[in-house]
């Protein structure tokens, strides 16, 4: 994978797979099997790979409806806090509800210089 000058957001590091990778890298650093610089490079590759994989492979659509509580736009990132949300997949099935949902929306690639 060519990383070039592009950088990707680190959003997916907080997903279950991202946390598992981070924990594993921490263990390898603690055991002195890799250095921290290599771990950071691996995480950078993960950021790019997960972004591109989701962009390419996810085809399902989701609709949601709720009450917008708060929104903000900072550093090219939108954040929405929504209450009483109902989710419906385009494949049918049962609707899912949640009391509160936080949605973070940004470009797949970070703008240059951030």
From Swiss-Prot:
<comment type="similarity">
    <text>Belongs to the TFIIA subunit 2 family.</text>
</comment>
<dbReference type="InterPro" id="IPR015871">
    <property type="entry name" value="TFIIA_gsu_C"/>
</dbReference>
<dbReference type="GO" id="GO:0005672">
    <property type="term" value="C:transcription factor TFIIA complex"/>
</dbReference>
<dbReference type="InterPro" id="IPR009088">
    <property type="entry name" value="TFIIA_b-brl"/>
</dbReference>
<dbReference type="GO" id="GO:0000979">
    <property type="term" value="F:RNA polymerase II core promoter sequence-specific DNA binding"/>
</dbReference>
<dbReference type="Pfam" id="PF02268">
    <property type="entry name" value="TFIIA_gamma_N"/>
</dbReference>
<comment type="subunit">
    <text>TFIIA is a heterodimer composed of the large toa1 and the small toa2 subunits.</text>
</comment>
<dbReference type="GO" id="GO:0017025">
    <property type="term" value="F:TBP-class protein binding"/>
</dbReference>
<dbReference type="GO" id="GO:0051123">
    <property type="term" value="P:RNA polymerase II preinitiation complex assembly"/>
</dbReference>
<dbReference type="InterPro" id="IPR009083">
    <property type="entry name" value="TFIIA_a-hlx"/>
</dbReference>
<dbReference type="GO" id="GO:0060261">
    <property type="term" value="P:positive regulation of transcription initiation by RNA polymerase II"/>
</dbReference>
<comment type="function">
    <text>TFIIA is a component of the transcription machinery of RNA polymerase II and plays an important role in transcriptional activation. TFIIA in a complex with tbp mediates transcriptional activity.</text>
</comment>
<protein>
    <recommendedName>
        <fullName>Transcription initiation factor IIA subunit 2</fullName>
    </recommendedName>
</protein>
<dbReference type="InterPro" id="IPR015872">
    <property type="entry name" value="TFIIA_gsu_N"/>
</dbReference>
<keyword id="KW-0805">Transcription regulation</keyword>
<keyword id="KW-0804">Transcription</keyword>
<dbReference type="Pfam" id="PF02751">
    <property type="entry name" value="TFIIA_gamma_C"/>
</dbReference>
<keyword id="KW-0539">Nucleus</keyword>
<dbReference type="InterPro" id="IPR003194">
    <property type="entry name" value="TFIIA_gsu"/>
</dbReference>
């Amino acid at each position: 994978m060519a990383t070039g000058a592009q950088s990707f957001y680190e959003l997916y590091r907080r997903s279950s797979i991202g946390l598992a990778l981070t924990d594993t890298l921490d263990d390898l650093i603690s055991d002195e099997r890799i250095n921290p610089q290599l771990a950071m490079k691996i995480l950078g590759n993960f950021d790019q790979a997960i972004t591109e994989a989701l962009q390419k492979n996810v085809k399902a659509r989701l609709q949601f409806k709720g009450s917008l509580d708060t929104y903000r736009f900072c550093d090219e990132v939108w954040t929405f806090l929504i209450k009483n949300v109902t989710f419906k997949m385009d494949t049918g099935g049962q609707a899912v509800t949640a009391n509160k949902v936080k949605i973070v929306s940004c470009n797949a690639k970070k703008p240059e210089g951030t």
